[in-house]
Structure formats: structure tokens, C-alpha cells
Swiss-Prot record:
This is Guanine nucleotide-binding protein alpha-1 subunit. G proteins are composed of 3 units; alpha, beta and gamma. The alpha chain contains the guanine nucleotide binding site. Keywords: GTP-binding, Hydrolase, Lipoprotein, Magnesium, Metal-binding, Myristate, Nucleotide-binding, Palmitate, Transducer. GTP binds at residues 49-54, 163, 188-189, 194, 222, 288-289, 291, 356.
Length: 384
């Protein structure tokens, strides 16, 4: 009898302990659910090379603790890979232009640099790149300074030359140092394709200020044909931040050299706007890479792009830059309203001029985004 009572008591104690654990789990879930309600979710979208991942890194630098030494060092192979990839694109591009261009002679690499060029092109085509040594950096610098390579670089928009090319080529000595640790600028310029989903949580006014919203920012990678698989997972996000590289109106895609990048951006923006899961979602459009755009538009007319074929230049210099930018901005505004259902026209839509590499501008822009979304929340709560 005593044994039975003892067992019964143990079972009751076990049940009580289990019930207490269940209650604690439920309490934590409830607390986390409440906490989640106060987090505004933002989704970063954009076509390849739009600069959205650079925006993501800027947010980490601006509103979090930035990159620690281990994270900075993890970018060493990325930076070195960018260097090798860049010099290969330029070398191979010069050979192609030397064979096919009308004025082909200026794209012929000098005899003394041809062997160096072949060697570096072979390295750039590998799956695994060697660490950048002083010797290799000197050879890359020699080839970079070759007149044919400089002529080729001037036509970089035709050859998939990355935006980071000039920056890394001008810093080869530092990048090849045996004790090299990437700077935050190196990390911002470094180009690596986003795969999967990465996220960070931040507040533009600091975590300790009660008035500040807390945001969770998602950067999503993936090929064009994979978008339909994951887009619905972000139903209910507070806002979509769509990055459009306005400087790329004369360039083609990496994955499809017959497809203009601006046309790809137009089609992606239109597709995202029409998604049912974003019917009540705010849209923040970042017209990115303005720093490149303002230089390019004075030399390459906007109307080389099919979408901008009705563009007519009106002036030169700063006035022409402003005119061209306003034209592009209006095109995106028209596309937004054409692609937005009548019952969704009251959702928030804002356009911001952006340069992802300009930290002060990114900080200012995100303060404006924060202010816009906080006002929307107050309005929906009936407090405005």
C-alpha cells in the first residue's frame, strides 16, 4: 500500500512539474508574441546589383554594433575574389573588343603585359582564389594601368565590370598586405551574391529610446525563377523597401546579357506591386546609385533604355542631371499607380534618392522611413 501511495505521489509531483513547465512555455510564447507585435518587419527587394545588400550592411554599421574583427576578416577572401574577378573581366573584355571593335587597336594589351594578363585571367577563372600577395597585386596593378585595360574600363557598362572595380584597383597595395583586415568601406564595396534570407533587428533612434520603433530587416537572395516560392512567406510585413539602381539603364543582366537591367527592375517592381500578400503593405522605393547616375547621364542618354525612349534632354550639367532624375522618378510613380489596385491606392508610397555607399545619406533616409512608418501607425491607431 505504501509503495502504491509513493508511486501515486511521484506521478502527481511529475504531473505538477510538467504542468508548471507547460505554463512557463505558454507564458514565454505569449510574451514573445506580444514583443513581436511591436516589431515592424521590413523586406528588402530589388534586382541583381541593385545595391540592396549594401543598404543592409549600412544598417548593420549605422544602427547595430557594426562588424567585429572576426566578421571583417571573413571578408578577406570576398575582397580578393572581387579583385581577381574584376581584372579577369577587364582582360577578357579587352581581347573581345580588340577582335570585334571598329577601332580595335586601342584595346590590344601591350606585348610586355600579355603574359601577365593571361596568368591573371586564368586565376580569375578558378573556383578557389589564392590570397592576394604583394607580387600578384603588383602584376594586377601593372595590367590595370595598361592603356588597353583603361580603354576597356571606360566601356565597363558593356562588360559586366562591377561597381567596386576602381575602388579595389586603387587600393591594391593595402589589400595585399600580409596583415590586411578589411575596413568598413571595403566591406561595403565587397560584392557577394545573397543566398537565402538574412535578417537584422535595429532601431533608427536607438534601442533605449521608447519613442523609437524596432525594425526587423530581411534581405532575400535567390534567382529570378525562385521568387514565387518565397514571396508569400512575407505576407504582413510593414513595408517593402525596393531598391532600383537607376544608373544601370544602359547595362544588361549577369544571367541574361540580352536583358536590360532597368527593364528587369521595372518588371520586378510591377510584379511585386501586384502580389496579393502586399495589398496593405507600404512601399519605400530607393532610387539607388545616384552617384553613378549623375556622372553617367551626362554622357549616356537615358533613351538608350526602351522604358525611357521618350526622354528628351533639355540642358547640360546639373540642370540636366536633375531633369533626368525627375523623369526616372516620374516613370516609377506612373508604374506604381498603374500596378496598384483601386482599393490599395491609400497605402503608403514614398520615393527616396539613394546612394548606398553614402553612410550619411542612408542614415538620413532611414530616419525619414522611420518617421513615415511611425506616422502611419499613429494614423491607423486613430491618434492622428
Amino acid at each position: 500500500m505504501g509503495l502504491v501511495c509513493s508511486r501515486s505521489r511521484r506521478f502527481r509531483e511529475a504531473d505538477a512539474e510538467e504542468n508548471a513547465q507547460d505554463a512557463e512555455i505558454e507564458r514565454r510564447i505569449e510574451l514573445e508574441t506580444k514583443a513581436e507585435k511591436h516589431i515592424q518587419k521590413l523586406l528588402l527587394l530589388g534586382a541583381g546589383e541593385s545595391g540592396k545588400s549594401t543598404i543592409f550592411k549600412q544598417i548593420k554599421l549605422l544602427f547595430q554594433t557594426g562588424f567585429d574583427e572576426a566578421e571583417l576578416k571573413s571578408y578577406i577572401p570576398v575582397v580578393h575574389a572581387n579583385v581577381y574577378q574584376t581584372i579577369k573581366v577587364l582582360h577578357d573584355g579587352s581581347k573581345e573588343l580588340a577582335q570585334n571593335d571598329f577601332d580595335s587597336s586601342k584595346y590590344v594589351i601591350s606585348n610586355e603585359n600579355q603574359d601577365i594578363g593571361e596568368k591573371l585571367s586564368e586565376i580569375g577563372g578558378r573556383l578557389d582564389y589564392p590570397r592576394l600577395t604583394k607580387e600578384l597585386a603588383q602584376e594586377i596593378e601593372t595590367l590595370w594601368e595598361d592603356a588597353a585595360i583603361q580603354e576597356t574600363y571606360a566601356r565597363g557598362n558593356e562588360l559586366q565590370v562591377p561597381d567596386c572595380a576602381h575602388y579595389f584597383m586603387e587600393n591594391l597595395e593595402r589589400l595585399s598586405d600580409a596583415n590586411y583586415v578589411p575596413t568598413k568601406e571595403d566591406v561595403l564595396y565587397a560584392r557577394v551574391r545573397t543566398t537565402g534570407v538574412v535578417e537584422i533587428q535595429f532601431s533608427p533612434v536607438g534601442e533605449n529610446k521608447r519613442s523609437g520603433e524596432v525594425y526587423r530587416l530581411f534581405d532575400v537572395g535567390g534567382q529570378r525563377n525562385e521568387r514565387r516560392k518565397w514571396i508569400h512567406l512575407f505576407e504582413g510585413v510593414t513595408a517593402v523597401i525596393f531598391c532600383a539602381a537607376i544608373s544601370e539603364y544602359d547595362q544588361t543582366l549577369y544571367e541574361d546579357e540580352n536583358k536590360n537591367r532597368m527593364m528587369e527592375t521595372k518588371e520586378l517592381f510591377e510584379w511585386v506591386l501586384r502580389q496579393p500578400c502586399f495589398e496593405k503593405t507600404s512601399f519605400m522605393l530607393f532610387l539607388n546609385k545616384f552617384d553613378i547616375f549623375e556622372k553617367k547621364v551626362l554622357n549616356v542618354p537615358l533613351n538608350v533604355c526602351e522604358w525611357f525612349k521618350d526622354y528628351q534632354p533639355v540642358s547640360t550639367g546639373k540642370q540636366e542631371i536633375e531633369h533626368a532624375y525627375e523623369f526616372v522618378k516620374k516613370k516609377f510613380e506612373e508604374l506604381y499607380f498603374q500596378s496598384t489596385a483601386p482599393d490599395c491606392v491609400d497605402r503608403v508610397f514614398k520615393i527616396y534618392q539613394a546612394t548606398a555607399l553614402d553612410q550619411k545619406l542612408v542614415k538620413k533616409t532611414f530616419k525619414l522611413v522611420d518617421e513615415t512608418l511611425r506616422r502611419r501607425n499613429l494614423f491607423e491607431a486613430g491618434l492622428l
